Amino acid sequence: MFLCVPHYTSITFPQLNDGRKVLRFGSYQRRGFRILAMSSSVSEASNYITAAPIFLPDGPWKQIPGGVTAAKGFKAAGLYGGLRAKGEKPDLALVACDVDAISAGAFTTNVVAAAPVVYCKNALDMSKTARAVLINAGQANAATAKRPSNDYQGDAGYQDVIECANALAKLLQMRPEEVLIESTGVIGHRIKKDALLNSLPKLVSSLSSSTEGADSAAVAITTTDLVSKSVAIESEVGGTNIRVGGMAKGSGMIHPNMATMLGVRLCFLHVLFCKVVTTDALVASDVWRKMVQIAVNRSFNQITVDGDTSTNDTVIALASGLSGSTRISSLISHEAIQLQACLDAVMQGLAKSIAWDGEGATCLIEGSSLVNAATIRIWRYRGHMAMPTGPLRIISLHLWYWAINHVELCFAAVYGRDPNWGRIACAAGYAGIPFQPNKLHISLGEILLMEGGQPLPFDRAAASNYLKKAGETHGTVGIHISIGDGAGRGQAWGCDLSYDYVKINAEYTT
């Protein structure tokens, strides 16, 4: 079994001659795996993969260990089942709930959606609850067979998913539609079904509510990730302590464009990623699905690494209701607002970890933007939709996203430690948001580069050093764009674009 180094501690391995702490993120040798995996006799683990740094926003919650198993009623496991093309890192993960959990999902809008994506959407249409999520790494099970029209019943990959779901449901003694399945890996490859089916009994028997169970599952879903991504928080909702936890994978093919089962398009943006979120809060099905919609829009749909929208993007969120909290039946209740904040925090923390771990990246880019009321009036007039999180916020996110996260030139400039703000101004101009050029402000960290549409003299050496320091420590570069002084604010996240990104992806399947 593989274990994650807990991300709420810092562990030193004596095997490292220089005694560096594994969680000193600036010391990573990116993509070389030279210090990220090492042998150990601790427990039954033969290797460790470190956990991503935690990027939780500030709020009335505390971080706790446990990931997807922190919430009451959930167990998890991860093991090697022979699905990976190379190595013996775990490649099968299972998250299960002791009771029927209220379920929600968000999925890629890519037309070539993977078989498990279609299966999960169908399952969520059939049932408001689910009790298990099975995830395999190695094969995406997307674009796996020809089929007439949109009939997935004739898709061999889809039939593989059904067979795996039925087998797992039998072992867990639940209905097949209560089993959800996610896949990640190489597109065009079907699941190694025989290997997966043979591994299910051991996977089920390994289920544990411990932190180790959650960590092993978080490791099992990784592919090109250098770190596992798992987090959990505890907070008070309506006078009762509830927990929200989650795990995610993603490093390349990151450009989410997901919609929920409500059929609402979530974003203006566009990972090959899989995510599972759990909570023990008690919440009505329709409210939970709307909450997940909002949280995904504020988190995973605001990140990008390479502008590539995957066939497999999936978020599954389960609520066991075992915390003893009062049932949340209204989206505008005080308790719902509290739970929404917790859900947002966990998803944002995981989303930022994905951007931080972008393939070949040396730093996280965090952008913020500001728009005014005049802009939103023009936006509405032109017929663009307003989202539940507030139209000013969405337009602000849209501006930031297109101005920074959709432009490889900006990513490359950050990697080159070049404070070339002209690329940012140029991209803002074609973001599709109408504004007066004399209202444009751009800053890099605390360094103001443009104000009122006019370039300002600034210390280029200091700006370059700011970027250099972030790259050397795998820190964060902050970029702010403003086209007004109104209340429309938003954030989004990306990473720099390095030579290593090209190398990693040029050699991905070879």
UniProtKB/Swiss-Prot annotation:
Cellular component GO terms, alphabetical: chloroplast
Cysteine pairings via disulfide bonds: none
EC number: 2.3.1.35, 2.3.1.1
Broad class of enzyme this protein falls into: transferase
Subcellular localization: Plastid, Chloroplast
Site annotation Cleavage: residues: 259-260
Swiss-Prot/TrEMBL GO biological process terms: L-arginine biosynthetic process
Metabolic or biological pathway: Amino-acid biosynthesis; L-arginine biosynthesis; L-ornithine and N-acetyl-L-glutamate from L-glutamate and N(2)-acetyl-L-ornithine (cyclic): step 1/1; Amino-acid biosynthesis; L-arginine biosynthesis; N(2)-acetyl-L-ornithine from L-glutamate: step 1/4
Subunit details: Heterodimer of an alpha and a beta chain.
Function per UniProt: Catalyzes two activities which are involved in the cyclic version of arginine biosynthesis: the synthesis of acetylglutamate from glutamate and acetyl-CoA, and of ornithine by transacetylation between acetylornithine and glutamate.
General remark: This protein may be expected to contain an N-terminal transit peptide but none has been predicted.
Similarity remark: Belongs to the ArgJ family.
Protein name: Arginine biosynthesis bifunctional protein ArgJ, chloroplastic
UniProt lineage: Eukaryota, Viridiplantae, Streptophyta, Embryophyta, Tracheophyta
